[in-house]
Swiss-Prot record:
Component of the cytochrome b6-f complex, which mediates electron transfer between photosystem II (PSII) and photosystem I (PSI), cyclic electron flow around PSI, and state transitions. GO terms for cellular component: chloroplast thylakoid membrane; cytochrome b6f complex. Belongs to the PetM family. The keyword Electron transport applies. Keywords: Chloroplast, Electron transport, Membrane, Photosynthesis, Plastid, Thylakoid, Transmembrane, Transmembrane helix, Transport. HAMAP family: Cytb6_f_PetM (MF_00396). This is Cytochrome b6-f complex subunit 7. It is a single-pass membrane protein. The chain crosses the membrane at residues 15-35. It comes from Trieres chinensis. It is found in: Plastid, Chloroplast thylakoid membrane. GO terms for biological process: photosynthesis. Its main location: plastid. One of its GO terms (molecular function) is electron transfer activity.
Length: 42
């Protein structure tokens, strides 16, 4: 968390938590989508 605060000195905990959650959800959705495409292609 200290590293994040160094990069974004103006960010507070709520903003950082929301951003990390959004990034994680996007990565999870993309990986799930690619997995479904591979299953459908077989």
């Amino acid at each position: 968390m200290a590293l994040v605060l160094k990069i974004f000195p103006y960010a507070n905990a709520e903003i950082v938590t929301a951003a990390v959650t959004c990034i994680f959800m996007v990565l999870f959705g993309l990986s799930l989508g690619f997995a479904l495409l591979k299953v459908q292609g077989e």
